[in-house]
Amino acid sequence: MLRDALLPAPLARSREPSFRRVERPARYLAARWTLEVLGKVVTALREGAAALREIPPEDLLAAWGDTVATFLRPSSLERRSLDPPLARLCGLSREGLKAGLEAVLGGVRREPAAALLARARPAPADAGPVLAVLASNLPALAVQPLLPTLLVRRPVLLKSPSAEPLFAPAFLAALVRREPRLANAVAAAAWPGGEEELEEPVLKGVGTVLAYGEREALDDLERRAPGKVIGYGPQTSLAVIGAEVDPREAAEGLARDIALFDQRGCLSVAAVYAAGDATALAERLGEALLDLARRWPPGPPARPALAAVQHLRLEAEMRSLWQSSLPVRSGTVIVDSNLKFRPSPGLRTVRVHPLEDLSRLPALLEPWRGRLQGAALAGDDAWRLEPRLMELGISRCAPPGELQSPDASWHNGGINPLEVLTSPSPPARRRSC
């Protein structure tokens, strides 16, 4: 049976932590952590740093590439055991989970990992282990902090969210099977966040905390681990479509950037600014979302999101705005002449804003400075905005359909992971997804 933890090798035969059986929403064994045992985990990782530094780069890359390739194959033993509970825990359909894993893992396969390795240099020997506090909105994101951490030769503890505790230990276990010399340098665990007494030995024993989550949680970690925390907070994304762009071609890519992960990611498109015929684009986008709803069925809708989308639809009807006739779970497209950027309530919902003069957009987005992550750009006028969008804090621009598939070279939120993991003192905390 799957477990929500992977222990460093020196603790693998220990009687602690004990495990309890969880039945719903998925079946697995959950560890019962104490502060003493978590302290031992961090100590074991610190002692495993020397062995990690001795692994030849080509061996580390080979193990990583083979593990990622295995997890990209739905027919692999690892995926066949992991996919059913992972889909239930993440609230995604099997098809939606498959598409999401392809997007995330595709960016860290052997080729982009090798390119990142070529730029990596070892961290100082006394840098200490890294704690990566993972978010629960997307599956498999553990690989994004894990890869650069291993490439700079720092041991790592992946703290999984309680809502999805299975991917990280499963991936680490597969990686260790391919490169046993990693056994002392990696660990995964899940416990309720914010428990100060339980987390005290962990925060004290690590050198860096890479934390993904809400602002309140990041602020709390910074208070308890001052100077160690690199925070990745909530952000959102948008699209800009030039007047010369074929609406049908743009719509297909936009639909992917909206529907992937059921619109839960920081690179999920929440609004579209169109210089051309906004209604024509919205019509094509509705058709594309309906097609994706058949190929990537949405997961069960959360009640608050469902209520918010229904309210948005009613508001659009009262304002006589054009809106799609899609079933609510398939998506919602609304043409809104109010140019103010607003986040999406989710469930594949997007506003299309007609904006003939795209040069006005950066000023319209100014209130969102530092809270925007990505922009899907199509057309020359849209791409000319890239430098000004970057000034607002946007860290990724890509054609529609490619926004949610960054590779390992992406600086999430403008943060260079190799730099923050090798710097003697982390830079000021930045906000990203």
Which positions does each model-derived feature cover?
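Short His-Asn-centered micro-motif
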Residues: 133-136, 159-161, 191-192, 211-214, ...
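NAD(P)-dependent aldehyde/semialdehyde dehydrogenase
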Residues: 261-376, 383-384, 388-429, 433
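Conserved NAD(P)+-binding/catalytic subdomain of aldehyde/semialdehyde dehydrogenases
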Residues: 179-271, 276, 404-433
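Donor nucleotide-activated moiety binding/catalytic core segment of transferases
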Residues: 117-137, 191-203, 335-347
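Short, structured coil segments at secondary-structure junctions
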Residues: 152, 205, 225, 392-393
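N-terminal Rossmann-like NAD(P)+-binding subdomain of aldehyde/semialdehyde dehydrogenases
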Residues: 1-127
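Conserved small-residue-rich beta-alpha loop and adjacent elements
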Residues: 113-179
